[in-house]
Amino acid sequence: MPATNILANLFVTLYNTEARRRGDCQVYPTSKLGVEVLGTLKKAGYIGEFEHVEDSRGGKFSVHLLAKITKCGAISPRFKVKKGEYTFWEQQYLPSYDRGMLVVTTNQGVMSHHEAAERGIGGFLIGYVY
């Protein structure tokens, strides 16, 4: 059965593979947003290298895990966040102030909420990881 929410499928696959203490995982299918989210997670140090493998069924990601994800998930519906409202959403989704990050999509691309607050821009919440 095809995945209806590709981003939620990506986060669930990462979380389940981390919970099983595996080093690598395969995520099907792929999307451009998934590439940007994985790039953000890699830049933050939650995952290692990842590779997009194109096949005839929507492609797949091959992701190397670093055993640094305790919990992650997609945020649905995608809530709109103004530039000064990140602390409210941190309290909703993250366990403490300095632990973890919210993944935000903005008009300047996908980034962490720390980077978006530093730039002074808002966007839509699409996921969290800690």
UniProtKB/Swiss-Prot annotation:
- What processes in GO biological process is this protein linked to? translation
SUPFAM superfamilies in the cross-refs? Ribosomal protein S8
Q: State if Ribosomal protein is listed as a keyword.
A: yes
What UniProt keywords apply to this chain's record, in alphabetical order?
Ribonucleoprotein, Ribosomal protein, RNA-binding, rRNA-binding
Is Cell membrane given among the entry's keywords?
no
Q: Name one GO cellular component term.
A: ribosome
A Gene Ontology molecular function term of the record: structural constituent of ribosome
Give the matching Pfam families. Answer: Ribosomal_S8 (PF00410)
**Source domain of life:** Archaea
The record's similarity note reads: Belongs to the universal ribosomal protein uS8 family.
User: What HAMAP family does this protein map onto?
Assistant: Ribosomal_uS8_A
Assembly mode: Part of the 30S ribosomal subunit.
Function according to Swiss-Prot or TrEMBL:
One of the primary rRNA binding proteins, it binds directly to 16S rRNA central domain where it helps coordinate assembly of the platform of the 30S subunit.
Protein name per its UniProtKB record:
Small ribosomal subunit protein uS8
Coding gene? rps8
